[in-house]
Regions:
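Extended, solvent-exposed segments with strong compositional bias
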Residues: 85-120, 125-127
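Short beta-strand-plus-loop segments that form exposed binding edges in beta-rich domains
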Residues: 138-140
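Primarily secretory-pathway and cell-envelope proteins
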Residues: 1-99, 143-188
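Short, well-ordered loop/turn elements at secondary-structure boundaries
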Residues: 53, 127-129
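A short tyrosine-centered beta-strand micro-motif
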Residues: 130-134
Length: 188
C-alpha cells in the first residue's frame, strides 16, 4: 500500500536493500517491469546520473541499507517549502538543488523499487506537471531530546531522517546538482 496525502506534505518510512533511496517520476520508468529492464536503466552510476540530469530521478543517498523516515514537502511560488524550526535545529546537511521534471506525481522508495508503478512501501506524492528544484536535508532526529523510546526507536512525532523540499524551479535556474552522492563530502 502506498502512502498518499494532500499536495503539500507526506511522511512515511521507506526502506532500501540497495543503499539508496530515490525520488522519481514514475512515468519516466514505465518500461521498467522486471529486474532485467531495471538493470538496463539503473544498474550503473552512469545510468543513474543520466536520469538525474534528465530530471526524472533525485537521489536520497543514505549510504547504506535500512529503513528511513522521509518527509516530502511541496511549496508554491507564493509560499516556498521550508524547514520547520525543529528541523532547522537538527539539520546535519542539505544538498544543492536537483532538477525534478514532474508529470503529475513523485514516488519515493529504494532505488530497487523504481518502476512505473507505486509498489508497497513506496511514498506517493502529487506534484503538478512542471520543473522543480528539489533540496534534500539530512536530519539528526536522534539529537532531539525525547525523540527515542527506551529501545532507541523513534517515538511518535520524532523528526524524520530526511526532509525533501520541492519548489518550482526559478526561471533561468540552470545549475542543478547531478551527482549520485546527495551531499558534498566534508572537507578535511
Amino acid at each position: 500500500m502506498t502512502a498518499q496525502q494532500p499536495l503539500d506534505e507526506v511522511t512515511a518510512t521507506v526502506a532500501t536493500d540497495a543503499g539508496m533511496l530515490v525520488l522519481w517520476d514514475p512515468q519516466r520508468f514505465e518500461a521498467v517491469v522486471d529486474y532485467d529492464t531495471w538493470e538496463d536503466e539503473l544498474l550503473e552510476d552512469e545510468d543513474i546520473v543520466r536520469h538525474i540530469q534528465a530530471g526524472s530521478l533525485v537521489p536520497l543517498n543514505a549510504g547504506g541499507d535500512g529503513a528511513f523516515a522521509v518527509q516530502i514537502r511541496s511549496g508554491t511560488a507564493a509560499a516556498p517549502a521550508a524547514l520547520t524550526e525543529r528541523e532547522t535545529a537538527h539539520q546535519l546537511v542539505a544538498s544543492q538543488p536537483y532538477l525534478f521534471v514532474s508529470r503529475g506525481r513523485a514516488l519515493v522508495g529504494g532505488i530497487e523499487d523504481v518502476s512505473g508503478d507505486a509498489s508497497d512501501g513506496v511514498i506517493e506524492h502529487p506534484v503538478p506537471e512542471g520543473r522543480y528544484a528539489v533540496v534534500v536535508h539530512l536530519i539528526d532526529w536522534q539529537a532531539e531530546a525525547g525523540s527515542q523510546d527506551a529501545a532507541g526507536r523513534p517515538v511518535p512525532g520524532a523528526l524524520p531522517d530526511f526532509v525533501v523540499l520541492i519548489d518550482l524551479a526559478q526561471p533561468g535556474q540552470g545549475a542543478f546538482r547531478t551527482a549520485v552522492n546527495t551531499f558534498e563530502a566534508p572537507n578535511g
